[in-house]
Amino acid sequence: MTSEFFAKILIILIRLYQILISPLFAPCCRFYPSCSEYAIIAVRKHGLSKGSRLALIRLFKCHPFHPGGYDPVR
């Protein structure tokens, strides 16, 4: 199995989160795009390994003491 296959699985799991779990909470993401959308873009653009790493870094920045704002995938 290739990393491309696992990248697609990860994207499906993130989409399921967006559809099933995210609506249960108030919209409070301090970033644009949202962290889940950022993760999908990062995995599509950089592949599974680097994209996942970028998504994790973004999640660690998501806390009340970070100002948030526009943070595109680079």
UniProtKB/Swiss-Prot annotation:
Database matches in PANTHER family: MEMBRANE PROTEIN INSERTION EFFICIENCY FACTOR-RELATED
Cell inner membrane among keywords: yes
Function of the protein: Could be involved in insertion of integral membrane proteins into the membrane.
Major localisation: membrane
Lipid bilayer topology: Peripheral membrane protein
Lineage: Bacteria, Pseudomonadati, Thermodesulfobacteriota, Syntrophia, Syntrophales
Protein name: Putative membrane protein insertion efficiency factor
Compartment(s): Cell inner membrane
Organism: Syntrophus aciditrophicus (strain SB)
Keywords, in A-Z order: Cell inner membrane, Cell membrane, Membrane
Family in the record: Belongs to the UPF0161 family.
One GO cellular component term noted in the UniProt record for this chain: plasma membrane
Keyword Flavoprotein included in the entry's annotation: no
One Pfam family cited in the UniProt record for this chain: YidD
Superkingdom of origin: Bacteria
